[in-house]
């Protein structure tokens, strides 16, 4: 298949190609079926290759009589398998309009074990079905006919009136009729006493639990687990997972067999082996069983007065086609069970939860297939359980596919970024001469750049002469397009395709200019296919005419011998993106310099906007937290409470000022200490837990009411560098609900007074009986959903109350429906279930999001008699607070990116300045010039150190390494004296104690220089014009080193009140007593932490007319000092 196009929507192009392929394949299927019916046992299976080739290419197939007859045969076949019988009823009269020939014998035959009373009922056209079943059975069937989606009740247990034999009735609707399959309940079976899916779910509980416990990231492990579980659940000799590829051919990707059986793992087979019509039926009926391929089929007799032929497509008894039976016999498979794996179509877009049709487009990903070497019957309840298991498997497959697509797209974006970088350095040859190159952009065997009449080749490619011939062919036959992609140059019409051999079959080409092009090549598909099945023995001869897995594999290789793997849409998107990049590069190749001034101006604007936005968001968030109607508290990294809003203060009776500073573990009940300790530990590691329940103590007048029960979500608070600096807990008070549940568990059966109570503390509650019928629906649920109690009682909870199409409360998608079934089933089997997210559309159309808590309902003997479901709703304030929090995080991330960019851009000119300084050191300079150069070098070193400080937490926590050197303070005097504009603008002199400055010391001189400069700047800003700044040093020696006192005085202050100097709030920030530190406050905090790393500390002293920073550090004396001593 080839595609010649300048650009296309990926989803639309894929969908249109897929539709065309289905139509073409259906025509092939029809021709093969007709050939088989005509040839019978002499059918040559290898003809599938010839038929495929005759319809191949891009020519649209014609809809002829053969195709029409084939589709009619598929849909209107009148044969069933003999393991059961079939009746079709008129919905209005309950009279039979069609029946299988074996129905009278199975349903009306007299049993000698049951005494006969009166005449035996006769079954035929026009018979009232209520006359051949017992009264309860007839009533159950009559009730089923009144259901909108009657399949929700399957299977219905019925008993024949004459024989008393039990049957499972499996009901489905077709146009104007109700079709019922009757399957006998085997003597060894324990018949299900109730209808509905919930009972069947129990059979697959273990398998579902195992699937859900698997970590994501491995499709192979997921398939292996599914196949193993199905193998154990069904008891067949072989279980396999089939995957359909993009071109509709299939592959066995996982397999489990009994010992001694020939493996089929790795087998590929042509698309014709599973016809498109069969795939369509698998989309409708998710499970298909063949009990015995040798069994004689039973005819279905239809009322001649019916104006149309009945379709049996939805029947569980529908007979398989003769060609499929022949295939099964040849592979020694007598019985089979097939489950469809239906996933979301990844090409579908535009679906939203609020759209009129919330269902996404679906596609058949593959099949889970079981084979048996002897006849095997699986009861309908177990088949239903397998269907549900396949639905859960499909959800996980869908998630793995989404994860794979994200990884692929991420890798493509990364490679594109690297290619862009190469183009900036060496355009355009960098994409073929450096690594990574264009072969890393998409999966291929070779790539070529055709640029300025020269050729650069990578990997396996055609020769230069062949490449020129391909380029000429493209310009001759595809001159109007900017590119071509095909999985078969032969099918695309390239005359020299056969001469290229197996090495080059598929090609993607894009035109950059009228003369320059890029090519990617792929070898034939067969080169990448390796069958993992039984090896071919030298003496064994294959008969390609027989329908058999080995023949399928051989036929598949024949079909794909001139084809490569198809080019996926995301790969073509990546190729077209590179094409556009190259075009722009060629246009701007002489003007590649970027206007950095514009970028810096934009970043500056972004920084200002980000600050204003962050401040606004922060103020709003603080207001919301304080006024929220849900309890919110926060702790720092030590577990000490630093946030306690009004609501939690009201609930606990503990005032804010009393709570601040207390350890969280001292405020919770002893029974909850371990839970909170674990949650706090994980949150500080960045692992945020959801829906954690614990009890917190009450105080004062509230202590008499007992502890408060909270369900909280832990949210790690992070700084600009994504380091965790605390934990915020957003809670929901469920004390009232817990009291209800505690009381419920203590009451023996009489719970109506609680459930139907209109007290606003009672949460929304609904429940089911053991058979899945809705048995409870309290007033809170009525208020929430808009559906009254009498409107939902005695409806199937799964399907009628909560479902997809005509349900009262419509769910978002199939995945939500399956997940609800899993949760209910888990509770029904007696297992403890966790709270899960749940959402549905209320009667008004509003989408309700909540938490669902499911509890089993027990009788006096402890047996499960149903489930109770409690809903917890998030308040409007909480939702708004979370929204504001997300905005805050996004703003912080934007600022962090801008900061990272600025730091990177500063490094380049700084390196240039350092280099220039080193070059000047080799020139003849005067003493004053040398001093200035030395000062400049020290300032550059300080700036370099600061740029390397990417992790401020390591400084704050004391994990920074100091670089120890000998120095004198005099050397660094110029650094902090001349580096402040305020000194010159205000005319403030800095007086130094020159004598003490000459002392030789040993320590981290650059960090000490940073500290001095920071504290000087802080004082200079707040010192009025004409003031004075004094820096003095004094020493006294100890055996372990020297202690340095530096006093920074601000004299002649013109402030009229005592205590003049820096604001008290800034001092608090320096000591870490104010969590909302400003930029100046953060700078002082870092400087103080650096001093503490030098075994010192900082004090701030206010005196009359002046104030001082007193900095003490412990430094060793240098060699000169030691000599003097």
From Swiss-Prot:
Residues 617-687, 750-821 form the PAS domain. It holds the Pfam family PAS. Keywords: Chromophore, Photoreceptor protein, Receptor, Repeat, Sensory transduction, Transcription, Transcription regulation. SUPFAM superfamilies: ATPase domain of HSP90 chaperone/DNA topoisomerase II/histidine kinase (SSF55874), GAF domain-like (SSF55781), PYP-like sensor domain (PAS domain) (SSF55785). GO terms for biological process: detection of visible light; red, far-red light phototransduction; regulation of DNA-templated transcription. Belongs to the phytochrome family. This is Phytochrome A.
């Amino acid at each position: 298949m080839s595609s010649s196009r300048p650009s296309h929507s990926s989803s639309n192009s894929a969908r249109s190609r897929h539709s065309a392929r289905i139509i073409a394949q259906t025509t092939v299927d029809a021709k093969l079926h007709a050939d088989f019916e005509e040839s019978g046992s002499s059918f040559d299976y290898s003809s599938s290759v010839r038929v495929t080739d005759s319809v191949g290419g891009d020519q649209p197939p014609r809809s002829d009589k053969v195709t029409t007859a084939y589709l009619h045969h598929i849909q209107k076949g009148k044969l069933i398998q003999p393991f059961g019988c079939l009746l079709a009823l008129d919905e209005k009269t309950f009279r039979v309009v069609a029946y299988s020939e074996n129905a009278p014998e199975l349903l009306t035959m007299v049993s000698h074990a049951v005494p006969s009373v009166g005449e035996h009922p006769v079954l035929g056209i026009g018979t009232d079905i209520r006359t051949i079943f017992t009264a309860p059975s007839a009533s159950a069937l009559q009730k089923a006919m009144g259901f909108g989606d009657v399949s929700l009740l399957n299977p219905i247990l019925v008993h024949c009136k004459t024989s008393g034999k039990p049957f499972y009735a499996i009901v489905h609707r077709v146009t104007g009729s109700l079709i019922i399959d009757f399957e006998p309940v085997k003597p060894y079976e324990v018949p299900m006493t109730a209808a509905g899916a919930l009972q069947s779910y129990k059979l697959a509980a273990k398998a579902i639990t195992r699937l859900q416990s698997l970590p994501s990231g491995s499709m192979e492990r997921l398939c292996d687990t599914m196949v193993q579980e199905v193998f154990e659940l069904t008891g067949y000799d072989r279980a396999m997972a089939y995957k359909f590829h993009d071109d509709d051919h299939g592959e066995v990707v996982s397999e489990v067999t009994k010992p001694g059986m020939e493996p089929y793992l790795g087998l590929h087979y042509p698309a014709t082996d599973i016809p498109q019509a069969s795939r369509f039926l698998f989309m409708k009926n998710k499970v298909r069983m063949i009990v015995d391929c040798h069994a004689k089929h039973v005819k279905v007799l239809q009322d001649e007065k019916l104006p149309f032929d009945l379709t049996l497509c939805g029947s569980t008894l529908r007979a398989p086609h003769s060609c499929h039976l022949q295939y099964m016999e040849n592979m020694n498979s007598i019985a089979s069970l097939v489950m469809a794996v239906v996933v979301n179509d990844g090409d579908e877009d535009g679906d939203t939860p609020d759209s009129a049709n919330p269902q996404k487009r679906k596609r058949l990903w593959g099949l889970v297939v079981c084979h048996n070497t002897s006849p095997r019957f699986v009861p309908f309840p177990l088949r239903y359980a397998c269907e549900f298991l396949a639905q859960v498997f499909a959800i996980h497959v869908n998630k793995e596919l989404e994860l794979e697509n994200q990884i692929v797209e991420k890798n493509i974006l990364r490679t594109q970024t690297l290619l862009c970088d190469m183009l900036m350095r060496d355009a355009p040859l960098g994409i073929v001469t450096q690594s990574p190159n264009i072969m890393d952009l998409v999966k291929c065997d070779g790539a070529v750049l055709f640029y300025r009449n020269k050729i650069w080749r990578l990997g396996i490619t055609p020769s230069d002469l062949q490449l020129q011939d391909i380029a000429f062919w493209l310009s001759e036959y595809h001159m109007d397009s900017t590119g071509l992609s095909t999985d078969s140059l032969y099918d695309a019409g390239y005359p020299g395709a056969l001469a290229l051999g197996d090495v080059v079959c598929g090609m993607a080409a894009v035109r950059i200019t009228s003369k320059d092009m890029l090519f990617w090549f792929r070898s034939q598909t067969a080169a990448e296919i390796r069958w993992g099945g039984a090896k071919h023995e030298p003496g064994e001869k294959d008969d390609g005419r027989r329908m058999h897995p080995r023949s399928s594999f051989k036929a598949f290789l024949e079909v794909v011998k001139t084809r490569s793997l198809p080019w996926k849409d995301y790969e073509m998107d990546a190729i077209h993106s590179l094409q556009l990049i190259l075009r722009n590069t060629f246009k701007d190749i002489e003007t590649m310099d970027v206007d950095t001034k514009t970028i810096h101006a934009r970043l500056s604007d972004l920084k200002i906007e980000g600050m204003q936005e962050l401040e606004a968001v922060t103020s709003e968030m603080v207001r919301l937290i304080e006024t929220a109607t849900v309890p919110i508290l926060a702790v720092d990294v030590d577990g000490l409470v630093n946030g306690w809003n009004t609501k939690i203060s009201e609930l606990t009776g503990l005032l804010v000022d009393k709570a601040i500073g207390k350890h969280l573990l001292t405020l919770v009940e002893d029974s909850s200490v371990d839970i909170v300790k674990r949650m706090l530990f994980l949150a500080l590691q960045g692992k945020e837990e959801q829906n954690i329940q614990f009890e917190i103590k009450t105080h004062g007048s509230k202590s008499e009411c007992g502890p408060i029960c909270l369900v909280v979500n832990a949210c790690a608070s992070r700084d600009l560098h994504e380091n965790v600096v605390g934990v915020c807990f957003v809670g929901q008070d469920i004390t009232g609900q817990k009291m209800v549940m505690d009381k419920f568990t203590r009451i023996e059966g009489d719970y109506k007074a609680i459930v139907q109570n209109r007290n606003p503390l009672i949460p929304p509650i609904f429940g089911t009986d053991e058979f899945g019928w809705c048995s409870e629906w309290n007033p809170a649920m009525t208020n929430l959903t808009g559906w009254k109690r009498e409107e939902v009682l005695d409806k199937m909870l799964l399907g009628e109350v909560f479902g997809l199409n005509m349900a009262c409360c419509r769910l978002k998608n199939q995945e939500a429906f399956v997940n609800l079934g899993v949760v209910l089933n888990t509770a029904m089997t007696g297992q403890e279930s966790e709270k899960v997210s749940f959402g549905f559309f209320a009667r008004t159309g509003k989408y309700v999001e909540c938490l669902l808590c499911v509890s089993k309902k027990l009788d006096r003997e402890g047996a499960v008699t149903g489930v109770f479901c409690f809903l917890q709703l998030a308040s409007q304030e909480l939702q708004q607070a979370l929204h504001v929090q997300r905005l805050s995080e996004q703003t912080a991330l934007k600022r962090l990116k801008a900061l990272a960019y600025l730091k990177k851009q500063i490094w380049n000119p700084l390196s240039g300045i350092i280099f220039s300084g080193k070059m000047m050191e080799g020139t003849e300079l005067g003493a004053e010039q040398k001093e200035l150069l030395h000062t400049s070098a020290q300032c550059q070193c300080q700036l370099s150190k600061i740029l390397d400080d990417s992790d401020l937490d390591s400084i704050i926590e004391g994990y920074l390494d100091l670089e120890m050197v000998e120095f004198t303070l005099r050397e660094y005097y110029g650094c902090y004296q001349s580096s402040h504009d305020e000194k010159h603008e205000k005319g403030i002199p800095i007086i130094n104690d020159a004598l003490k400055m000459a002392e030789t010391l040993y320590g981290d001189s650059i960090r000490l220089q940073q500290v001095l400069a920071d504290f000087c700047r802080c004082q200079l800003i707040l010192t009025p014009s004409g003031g004075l700044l004094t820096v003095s040093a004094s020493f006294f020696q100890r055996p372990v080193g020297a202690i340095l006192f530096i006093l920074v005085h601000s004299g002649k202050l013109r402030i009229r009140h005592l205590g003049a100097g820096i604001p008290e709030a800034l001092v608090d920030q320096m000591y870490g007593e104010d969590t909302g530190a400003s930029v100046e406050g953060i700078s002082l905090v870092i400087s103080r932490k650096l001093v503490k790393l030098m075994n010192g500390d900082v004090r701030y002293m206010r005196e009359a007319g002046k104030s001082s920073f007193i900095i003490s550090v412990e430094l060793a004396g240098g060699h000169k000092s030691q000599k003097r001593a």
